[in-house]
């Protein structure tokens, strides 16, 4: 199962970013494919936080538009929201230690841990910091969707 992180959701949503077309193509492919794909639960709130933030986007996305985009993705029948399970605390601490994660990287460790717990085969991301987590394979937007 491929999972997508917040950066992909943001780029697919915001038309003015250079990565918009490729992120939208990836998300469309994932959402329409019958194969399971995942979104770490942490990315849902982070997406809303970023796209509605007036210091990040001018103008920011209206809350209702952000929620509409989010619920549009959640309607994909092949999507699984990846929630922490019983192994999550140990996996999270392992990922924190492995990457010596502090600050913002600690948030990425959460995503990596929940993906590993759900046996995600690759995380689609524009964030190269995920390379610090050896147990998690990642894909970039330049890796064409198949």
Please identify what each model-predicted range represents.
Residues 33-34, 76-77, 133:
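Structured helix-beta-strand junction loops
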Residues 5, 108, 127:
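Acidic active-site catalytic centers that drive phospho-/nucleotidyl reactions
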Residues 1-39, 54-68, 146:
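Short, well-structured N-terminal submotif of metal-dependent ribonuclease cores
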Residues 1, 112-113, 117-146:
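Acidic, PIN/NYN-like endoribonuclease modules and their adjacent C-terminal/linker elements
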Residues 8, 43, 87-88, 111, ...:
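Alpha-helix capping/helix-boundary segments
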Residues 38-41, 125:
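Short beta-strand segments at enzyme active-site cores
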Residues 36, 60, 79-122:
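Active-site neighborhoods of divalent-metal-dependent phosphate/nucleic-acid chemistry enzymes
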């Amino acid at each position: 199962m491929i999972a997508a992180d917040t950066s992909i959701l943001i780029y697919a949503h915001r038309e003015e970013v250079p990565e918009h077309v490729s992120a939208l193509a990836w998300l469309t492919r994932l959402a329409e494919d019958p194969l399971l794909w995942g979104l770490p639960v942490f990315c849902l709130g982070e997406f809303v936080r970023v796209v509605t933030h007036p210091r990040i986007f001018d103008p920011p996305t209206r809350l209702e538009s952000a929620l509409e985009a989010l619920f549009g993705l959640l309607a994909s029948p092949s999507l699984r929201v990846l929630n922490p399970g019983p192994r999550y605390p140990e996996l999270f601490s392992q990922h924190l230690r492995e990457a010596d994660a502090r600050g913002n990287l600690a948030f990425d460790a959460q995503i990596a841990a929940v993906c590993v717990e759900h046996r995600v085969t690759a995380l689609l991301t524009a964030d190269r910091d995920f390379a610090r987590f050896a147990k998690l394979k990642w894909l970039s937007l330049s890796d064409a969707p198949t």
